[in-house]
Amino acid sequence: MAPNPRKSHPLLKMINNSLIDLPTPPNISAWWNFGSLLALCLVTQILTGLLLAMHYTADTTLAFSSVAHTCRNVQYGWLIRNMHANGASFFFICIYMHIGRGFYYGSYLHKETWNTGVLLLLTLMATAFVGYVLPWGQMSFWGATVITNMFSAIPYIGQTIVEWAWGGFSVDNPTLTRFFALHFLLPFMIAGLTLIHLTFLHESGSNNPLGIVSNCDKIPFHPYYSLKDILGLALLLLPLTAMALFSPNLLGDPENFTPANPLVTPPHIKPEWYFLFAYAILRSIPNKLGGVLALAASVLVLLLCPFLHTSKQRTMAFRPLSQSLFWILVANLLILTWIGSQPVEHPFIIIGQLASTTYFIILLILFPITSALENKMLNF
């Protein structure tokens, strides 16, 4: 019989083993769709970003007007920009759902896959942050100033690091130039990390909603899940396109329609909605260094998940107490997101402090205790 190039060709063989003949659990739900949706988001962002970069000028005097020029004079420039800006929001919606699914179903017990995933999240956050600075509006400028200035909280070397990052004594032209370079580079780093993430995932195989080994009962990825993923892609592209066409500025900040002015501070500096939960945690601590450490901990706490797993069962599918705690955590994150968008005044300060404390207590204390309690209940 003639050899099948799909299975023998060095390149096609890799694609075949990852996307066609990949053995997949037969019972994975729609929550497992978000991996491929994230890949779609990345491709969309790189393509639209490449087209935008062709018309963008990384100079403080021209950046704002070059973005305006793209929207006004470039063929479909407005659409490309709207897809790129809102694509970032959908990217974060997908990654938060993906992390939530991993947390709920115990996927973090694949330690290498989970750790590369956390690294991907951090890289994505860095990419989104430097990208937000590029239009050089008021919120871009002041957001860059506030967030980069946090590094000055590091003892001894903090101020030096900040000035080194700025390329001067304030956020100015060198800062914008290097942020553009970083924003161009990081998505390709994300693409590389994604391949490492997938390599680790395919080493162990996918988890499933029951959390049990399904090696004896797997089905090929194509045509079953390839078709299911295409439905997911359509359901993602539909709201993204609708948003880009009908309400492109819904999630943006009106301040960013004003060109950057170092002499006028906006009344309320805040990042994009997807960083608000971390921003609320940062603001809830009155001490600068303490706030920065809490901000870092709010994301890095994910690295501890595999070590805090005390349950005999992998997923939360049959653990009602942990389920309740999980949804309380989700509600808590939504409260933090809301608090991050509010001004620093009573009652928002105390609500933010309570929500921040609750966030860490649930993750670090209540989940391990509840899991241990559920183990005890299994004996009765």
From Swiss-Prot:
Give the matching SUPFAM superfamilies.
a domain/subunit of cytochrome bc1 complex (Ubiquinol-cytochrome c reductase), Transmembrane di-heme cytochromes
Subcellular locations according to the entry:
Mitochondrion inner membrane
Cofactor annotation? heme b
The entry marks the following residues as binding a ubiquinone, namely H202
Main location, first listed in the record = mitochondrion
Bilayer-crossing regions: 34-54, 78-99, 114-134, 179-199, 227-247, 289-309, 321-341, 348-368
Q: Which Pfam families match?
A: Cytochrom_B_C, Cytochrome_B
Q: Which UniProt keywords apply?
A: Electron transport, Heme, Iron, Membrane, Metal-binding, Mitochondrion, Mitochondrion inner membrane, Respiratory chain, Transmembrane, Transmembrane helix, Transport, Ubiquinone
GO biological process terms, semicolon-separated? mitochondrial electron transport, ubiquinol to cytochrome c
> What does the note accompanying the cofactor annotation read?
Binds 2 heme b groups non-covalently.
List the membrane topology term(s).
Multi-pass membrane protein
Entry-linked PROSITE patterns: CYTB_CTER, CYTB_NTER
Binding residues for heme b b562: H84, H183
Q: Which GO terms describe its molecular function?
A: metal ion binding; ubiquinol-cytochrome-c reductase activity
| GO CC annotations, alphabetized | mitochondrial inner membrane; respiratory chain complex III
Q: Into which family does the record put it? A: Belongs to the cytochrome b family.
How is this protein organized at the quaternary level? The cytochrome bc1 complex contains 11 subunits: 3 respiratory subunits (MT-CYB, CYC1 and UQCRFS1), 2 core proteins (UQCRC1 and UQCRC2) and 6 low-molecular weight proteins (UQCRH/QCR6, UQCRB/QCR7, UQCRQ/QCR8, UQCR10/QCR9, UQCR11/QCR10 and a cleavage product of UQCRFS1). This cytochrome bc1 complex then forms a dimer.
What more does the record tell us? Heme 1 (or BL or b562) is low-potential and absorbs at about 562 nm, and heme 2 (or BH or b566) is high-potential and absorbs at about 566 nm.
Question: What's the stated role of this polypeptide?
Answer: Component of the ubiquinol-cytochrome c reductase complex (complex III or cytochrome b-c1 complex) that is part of the mitochondrial respiratory chain. The b-c1 complex mediates electron transfer from ubiquinol to cytochrome c. Contributes to the generation of a proton gradient across the mitochondrial membrane that is then used for ATP synthesis.
What is this protein's name?
Cytochrome b
Q: Which organism is it from?
A: Oceanodroma tristrami (Tristram's storm-petrel)
Q: Which gene encodes it?
A: MT-CYB
